[in-house]
A protein has these predicted regions:
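Short, low-complexity, intrinsically disordered N-terminal peptides in bacterial proteins
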Residues: 1-2, 89
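Short phosphate-binding loop-to-helix
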Residues: 52-101
Length: 101
């Protein structure tokens, strides 16, 4: 079976704006989540609607997929990212893991 882990990340969170970029021991929070996730899954990406998050992911060598800002949930964001990632890589997946950071 082929698995993909997708980490939905929004900058404009209502409870903790900017959470994905919050510094934790010298790294943005999203990097900590991505590094641990990529230790388990061969295919891993961050789904975001914010260029600041995408740029941070690019800086540490991760995979970021830009998604629409109009999604009502992280699951909707993951679905769009899965579609884009699958088309870009030509890979079909059997299961999607929605990783919350």
């Amino acid at each position: 079976m082929k698995f993909i882990a997708i980490i939905p990340a929004r900058y404009a969170s209502t409870r903790f704006p900017g959470k994905p970029l919050a510094d934790i021991q010298g790294k943005p929070m999203i990097q900590h989540v991505y590094e641990r996730t990529s230790q388990v899954f061969a295919h891993c990406c961050v789904a975001t609607d914010d260029t600041r998050i995408a740029e941070a992911v690019d800086r540490f060598g991760g995979c970021a997929v830009m998604t629409s800002p109009d999604h009502r949930s992280g699951t909707d964001r993951c679905a769009e990212a899965l579609d884009k990632y699958s088309k870009t890589t030509g890979t079909a997946f059997d299961a999607v893991i929605n990783v919350q950071g």
